[in-house]
């Protein structure tokens, strides 16, 4: 396939072979360990007694049954759907949700395993405040939180930006997927791509726990995607100070969309060490993902006034020669050291190297009745080299009746992006409903070096932060105040000709934060925050501009939020009300001589309410989900033409509900169900066409039982059980179709 280097094909094959070898090795190791345990002499109480020959004791059926039951109880508890209130809050560290003035929750690795999630977007289908769409013209996942996007470049790992695979992400390497609703410039700094204004996603690597684990999983999804994973964790040394966690996962095959194939390989090695004062972890990872013949998003021609009907749920209107192949090597080092019981120093350093290639084709519908469309072809290689770091100090002390937690530190990110392209000069005819296979067009219009792309941008982000969280009245009231100084240095280059620098941006900003938490009772809290989002300002560009080249300071988005939380440990609920105002830009006529002016006077104001409920409602009955309402209002638009209209692709409401029910008459059996409901979405800023409301139902079951004194869990599920055809998203002005009915099966056993 064009653009896929032989070395990358070799890496992919090596990853698959490594998976098989690791599986065989661990199975052999487990069998050997079991044999050694069975033949090893039993320990005695005294040295004298050691000379007495011990007679092996055979366990009675009752004892074996009791052991099996204990294993099953543990396995069933581990399989339960769990969403944790709280998570890692950047500058503030890891906190319980009840104690912070922000709305944050964490989806665990057990949930990821039980739902057979293969991408980050599939994990976030559980969240009522998140909707997923594709990137512009490709198959990357973009997440929409509170009406604003989070690009893959702006997803963090353990609070570090710039080290995450940016298009598609394999979730099997992570212990938690954490979602923060709301702006986060103080907490995490400015995101490198300028998104994450309405929310932030943070991933936490798996590390070895005190209980050893050797977990083997096999997966299947229709129409023919097969895969599996191996998760091994051990602690060793004195006081179990050393830990090692190894993860291998992969899949390959045709999805439930006609002629679409996906493949992935993920390898992770996580090492950690600790003593009484110091904690060190090192995480190293490789990931490959790819899509062949993927179903793309759908653009609408300028003359289209209505939304075309939705094609058959499994119909693929893409071309089979399209593909992407994404390779990433990434990792990080974390260090914490307690100077005393009141003062902790910490630091982290991470890096990413990526090599992406793809041949893309996105169709544009020109007749919504017949589905007549045109499409083009473009090959794009893209590479990144990123480095990211942070460091700081966290201190606790008292001043009279007031307890203080001081957080101070800084962060830095260096990012270089390189790209090129080749494209077909003319488009070809196609159809949304009756799509014929078309030979790949000749792509003879080239920009840049396809084999060794030149830099298109170099980004340097530096920041310093300080905050003080003051607690009063035995912790019943906590007030957080702080700020982050952010500097942005961004250079643009002509990657398509001589590589010369074409733009220079160097600006800074200070973003404050104020947060208040009041605990009326031990299990409840009321909170408020005022925090900002931050993104690069623009430089005036265009034709006949009177302010051509004017550089604008960074965009500051302002959020106000108030809410309430209830947390019993097994059950949590959060109710939040918020407003986020984000500036934007436009060009409008200036005078009567054909001149224009570039302004940053526009505004998008998103107001909304969020309700989330997680945990055990009744014994054996668990629920995770909630609902959101949002009003995404456009204000101060160019010449006032769209004032009061709703922003494109933001539904007026969303509902998600996940339910688990343990069958009382069959121990170990659990029924699972999920519903997703998404409200009306406008397709254009004129608000003349919109997507209808859509609803999707998923059903499934799992059963845990013992085989040879080992727990085995079988799972079966059906996503979109009614095979509903629907347009899932209109974000950014293009349509994304929902997935067809998909059957899933998996097994997991602890060896």
Q: PLM ranges: what are they?
A:
Residues 474, 579, 599-685:
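Gram-negative outer-membrane beta-barrel transporters
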Residues 6, 406, 528, 560, ...:
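Conserved C-terminal beta-signal and adjacent last beta-strands/turns
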Residues 334-338, 344-350, 354-360, 527, ...:
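Membrane-embedded beta-barrel scaffold of Gram-negative outer-membrane proteins
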Residues 384, 403-415, 453-582, 606, ...:
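Structural signature of Gram-negative outer-membrane beta-barrels, strongest in the C-terminal barrel
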Residues 290-302, 414-418, 513, 517-561, ...:
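Surface-exposed extracellular loop regions of Gram-negative outer-membrane beta-barrel proteins
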Residues 172-175, 185-269, 273-279, 329, ...:
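Outer-membrane beta-barrel translocator/receptor signature
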Residues 64-211, 562, 732:
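Acidic, small-polar-rich N-terminal luminal/periplasmic segments of exported/outer-membrane proteins
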Residues 251-255, 268-338, 351-384, 427-453, ...:
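Acidic/polar loop-and-plug regions of large Gram-negative outer-membrane beta-barrel proteins
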């Amino acid at each position: 396939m064009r653009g896929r280097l032989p070395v990358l094909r070799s890496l992919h094959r090596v990853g698959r072979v490594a998976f098989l070898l690791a599986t065989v090795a661990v199975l052999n190791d487990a069998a050997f360990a079991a044999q050694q345990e069975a033949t090893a002499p039993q320990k005695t109480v005294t040295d004298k007694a050691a000379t007495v020959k011990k007679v092996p004791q055979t366990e009675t059926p009752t004892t074996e049954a009791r052991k099996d039951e204990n294993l099953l109880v543990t396995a069933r508890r581990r399989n339960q759907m769990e969403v944790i209130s709280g998570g890692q809050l950047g500058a503030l560290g890891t906190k319980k949700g009840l104690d912070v003035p922000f709305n944050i929750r964490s989806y665990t690795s057990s949930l990821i395993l039980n739902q057979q999630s293969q991408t980050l977007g599939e994990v976030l289908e559980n969240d009522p405040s998140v909707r997923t769409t594709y990137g512009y013209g490709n198959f990357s996942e973009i997440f929409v939180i509170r009406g604003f996007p989070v690009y893959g470049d702006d997803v963090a790992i353990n609070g570090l930006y710039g080290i995450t695979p940016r298009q598609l992400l394999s979730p099997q390497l992570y212990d938690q997927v954490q979602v923060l609703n709301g702006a986060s410039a103080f907490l995490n700094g400015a995101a490198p791509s300028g998104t994450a204004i309405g929310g932030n996603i943070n991933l936490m690597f798996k590390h070895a726990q005190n209980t050893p684990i050797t977990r083997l999983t096999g997966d299947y999804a229709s129409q023919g995607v097969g895969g599996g994973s191996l998760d091994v964790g051990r602690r060793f040394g004195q006081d179990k100070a050393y830990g090692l966690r190894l993860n291998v996962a992969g899949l390959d095959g045709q999805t439930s969309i006609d002629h679409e194939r996906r493949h992935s390989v993920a390898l992770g090695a996580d090492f950690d060490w600790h003593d009484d004062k110091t904690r060190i972890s090192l995480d190293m990872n490789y990931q490959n993902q790819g899509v062949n013949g993927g179903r793309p998003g759908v653009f609408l021609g300028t003359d289209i006034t209505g939304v075309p009907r939705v094609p058959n749920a499994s119909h693929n209107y893409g071309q089979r020669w399209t593909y992407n192949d994404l390779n990433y090597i990434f990792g990080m080092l974390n260090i914490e050291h307690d100077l005393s019981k009141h003062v902790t120093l910490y630091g982290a350093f991470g890096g990413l190297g990526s090599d992406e290639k793809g041949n893309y084709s996105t169709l544009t519908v020109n007749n919504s009745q017949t589905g007549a469309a045109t499409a083009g072809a473009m090959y794009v290689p893209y590479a990144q080299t990123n480095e990211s770091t942070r460091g700081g100090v966290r201190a606790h002390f008292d001043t009279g009746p007031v307890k203080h937690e001081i957080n101070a530190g800084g962060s830095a990110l260096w990012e270089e992006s390189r790209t090129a392209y080749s494209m077909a000069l003319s488009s070809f005819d196609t159809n949304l409903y009756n799509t014929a296979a078309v030979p790949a067009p000749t792509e003879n219009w080239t920009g840049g070096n396809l084999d060794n792309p030149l830099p298109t941008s170099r980004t340097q982000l530096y920041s310093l932060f300080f905050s003080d969280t003051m607690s009063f009245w035995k912790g019943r009231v906590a007030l957080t105040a702080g700020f982050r100084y952010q500097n942005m240095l961004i250079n643009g280059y002509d990657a398509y000709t001589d590589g010369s620098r074409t733009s220079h941006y160097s600006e800074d900003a200070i973003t404050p934060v104020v947060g208040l938490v009041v605990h009326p009772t031990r299990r409840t809290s009321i909170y408020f925050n005022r925090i900002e989002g931050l993104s690069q300002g623009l430089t005036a560009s265009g034709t006949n501009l009177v302010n051509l080249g004017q550089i604008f300071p960074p965009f500051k988005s302002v959020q106000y939020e108030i809410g309430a939380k209830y947390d019993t440990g097994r059950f949590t609920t959060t109710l939040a009300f918020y407003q986020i105002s984000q500036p934007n830009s436009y060009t409008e006529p200036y005078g009567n001589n054909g001149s224009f002016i570039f302004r940053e006077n526009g505004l998008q104001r998103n107001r909304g309410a969020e309700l989330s409920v997680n945990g055990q409602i009744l014994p054996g009955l668990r629920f995770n989900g909630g609902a959101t309402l949002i009003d995404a209002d456009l204000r101060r638009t160019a010449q006032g033409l769209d004032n009061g209209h709703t922003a494109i692709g933001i539904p007026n409401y969303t509902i998600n509900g996940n339910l688990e029910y343990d069958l009382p008459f069959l121990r170990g059996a659990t029924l699972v169900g999920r519903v997703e409901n998404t409200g009306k979405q406008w397709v254009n800023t004129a608000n003349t066409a919109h997507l209808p409301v859509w609803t999707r139902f998923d059903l499934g079951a799992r059963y845990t039982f013992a085989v040879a004194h080992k727990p085995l869990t079988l799972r079966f599920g059906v996503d979109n059980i009614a095979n509903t055809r629907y347009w899932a998203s209109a974000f950014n002005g293009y349509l994304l179709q929902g997935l067809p009915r998909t059957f899933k099966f998996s097994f997991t056993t602890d060896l």
